[in-house]
Curated annotation (Swiss-Prot):
<comment type="similarity">
    <text>Belongs to the CDP-alcohol phosphatidyltransferase class-I family.</text>
</comment>
<keyword id="KW-0479">Metal-binding</keyword>
<dbReference type="InterPro" id="IPR000462">
    <property type="entry name" value="CDP-OH_P_trans"/>
</dbReference>
<feature type="transmembrane region" description="Helical">
    <location>
        <begin position="89"/>
        <end position="108"/>
    </location>
</feature>
<comment type="function">
    <text>Catalyzes both phosphatidylcholine and phosphatidylethanolamine biosynthesis from CDP-choline and CDP-ethanolamine, respectively. Involved in protein-dependent process of phospholipid transport to distribute phosphatidyl choline to the lumenal surface. Has a higher cholinephosphotransferase activity than ethanolaminephosphotransferase activity.</text>
</comment>
<feature type="transmembrane region" description="Helical">
    <location>
        <begin position="156"/>
        <end position="176"/>
    </location>
</feature>
<feature type="binding site">
    <location>
        <position position="158"/>
    </location>
    <ligand>
        <name>Mg(2+) 2</name>
    </ligand>
</feature>
<keyword id="KW-0464">Manganese</keyword>
<keyword id="KW-0472">Membrane</keyword>
<dbReference type="GO" id="GO:0031965">
    <property type="term" value="C:nuclear membrane"/>
</dbReference>
<keyword id="KW-0539">Nucleus</keyword>
<dbReference type="Pfam" id="PF01066">
    <property type="entry name" value="CDP-OH_P_transf"/>
</dbReference>
<feature type="transmembrane region" description="Helical">
    <location>
        <begin position="368"/>
        <end position="388"/>
    </location>
</feature>
<feature type="binding site">
    <location>
        <position position="86"/>
    </location>
    <ligand>
        <name>CDP-choline</name>
    </ligand>
</feature>
<feature type="transmembrane region" description="Helical">
    <location>
        <begin position="286"/>
        <end position="306"/>
    </location>
</feature>
<dbReference type="InterPro" id="IPR048254">
    <property type="entry name" value="CDP_ALCOHOL_P_TRANSF_CS"/>
</dbReference>
<keyword id="KW-0808">Transferase</keyword>
């Protein structure tokens, strides 16, 4: 989504309103706002100026998109015009996260059997998220409220959803019995999502493949339903000829999908730079974004393999969420770098959580690794939320709009 939403008064004017659009801020609201806001604005004046000039560009369509368009068009017409697009997105994300956390609660090591209704809830939660995520842009155009903030918010929610979706899938097939495969599948998912925006940072255009997010989500929904129908015996059954367990089949599909997608992504990354001398949209090296995701995956792999207490094997869900929050933040920063045509800096507070785990192992687990993992999880989550809230509030204030509310006023022109 791009363009401009309806205007509003800035926070701090004669009738101060919260940037998130919930009206007058109470004392508690002010305290929370300070707690979840960075001490200094994350974006510079020049970045905000370039953000205003940003225009959303996409190319291609996936296999199922034409079939789903009719349903999405029908669904968006059922949504009241006063509901903000970002509110639609955050509702879908919240449902997706809550249903996945149910599975995490029942299956903390991804080897247990959850109640059947939990798998059904997870399948429904993912379908709801897919549906709402697909119509937020349509709602923005329908209400003439498109903005760069809407595009950023949409991608930000997707980055977090990716973490929970891949984790929920691994739990559904009980992949915790094969920790190496679970590690690969979870980090392959976040890596591919990062690469999708990496090539956008290079080329300026978000490209969709024949097999893309919609198709993968439908496949995952089917796997949740198979967990309901077949249960553990189904995933533990052997595939004839291949002589592997059924649960390994989705992992092999992930390998194939990673190779296929990354081939297309890196073709664009190495040849599609729109900046000077084939550089990124910001004029930086096309390889520079690799340092961030490469650091995350390298740290995750080293800590996994060097743990003396089998930290990942015993607590895979906590581990994936910890590094997933880190990946989500650096992906969000990549999206911001693309939309503001700016450089990505490697130094980031997102790496503090993984660094704590690494240093604890370096000093022979001076503190119980499980305790440090919880500290890293909480810090990484707080760091992600703090950054996202700060960016959204700053952009909303700059564009004179609300994050979660459409203000009735003279509509601005659409760019999406």
């Amino acid at each position: 989504m791009s363009g401009h939403r309806s205007t509003r008064k800035r926070c701090g004017d004669s009738h101060p309103e919260s940037p998130v659009g919930f009206g007058h801020m109470s004392t508690t609201g002010c305290v929370l706002n300070k707690l979840f806001q960075l001490p200094t604005p994350p974006l510079s004046r020049h970045q905000l100026k370039r953000l205003e000039e940003h225009r959303y560009q996409s190319a291609g369509r996936s296999l199922l998109e034409p079939l789903m368009q009719g349903y999405w068009e029908w669904l968006v017409r059922r949504v009241p015009s006063w509901i903000a697009p970002n509110l639609i997105t955050i509702i879908g994300l919240s449902i997706n996260i809550c249903t996945t956390i149910l599975l995490v609660f029942y299956c903390p090591t991804a080897t247990e059997q959850a109640p059947l209704w939990a798998y059904i809830a997870c399948a429904c939660g993912l379908f709801i998220y897919q549906s709402l995520d697909a119509i937020d842009g349509k709602q923005a155009r329908r209400t003439n409220s498109s903005s760069p903030l809407g595009e950023l918010f949409d991608h930000g929610c997707d980055s977090l959803s990716t973490v929970f979706v891949v984790l929920g899938t691994c739990i559904a097939v009980q992949l915790g019995t094969n920790p190496d495969w679970m590690f690969f599948c979870c980090f392959a998912g976040t890596f591919m999502f990062y690469c999708a925006h990496w090539q956008t940072y290079v080329s300026g255009t978000l490209r969709f493949g024949i097999i893309d997010v919609t198709e993968v989500q439908i496949f995952i929904i089917i796997m949740h339903l198979l967990a309901v129908i077949g249960g553990p015996p189904f995933w533990q059954s052997m595939i004839p000829v291949l002589n592997i367990q059924m649960k390994i089949f989705p992992a092999l599909c992930t390998v194939a999908g990673t190779i296929f997608s990354c081939t297309n992504y890196f073709r664009v990354i190495f040849t599609g730079g729109v900046g000077k001398n084939g550089s990124t949209i910001a004029g930086t090296s096309v390889l520079s974004p690799f340092l961030h995701i490469g650091s995350v995956i390298t740290l995750a792999a080293m800590i996994y393999k060097k743990s003396a207490v089998q930290l990942f094997e015993k607590h895979p869900c906590l581990y994936i969420l910890t590094f997933g929050f880190v990946s989500a933040k650096i992906t969000n920063k990549l999206v911001v770098a693309h939309m503001t045509k700016s450089e990505m800096h490697l130094h980031d507070t997102a790496f503090i959580g993984p660094a704590l785990l690494f240093l604890d192992q370096y000093f022979n687990s001076f503190i119980d690794e499980y305790i440090v993992l919880w500290i890293a999880l909480v810090f990484s989550f707080f760091d992600l939320i703090r950054y996202c809230v700060s960016v959204c509030n700053q952009i909303a204030s700059h564009l004179h709009i609300h994050v979660f509310r459409i203000k009735v006023s003279t509509a601005h022109s659409n760019h999406h």
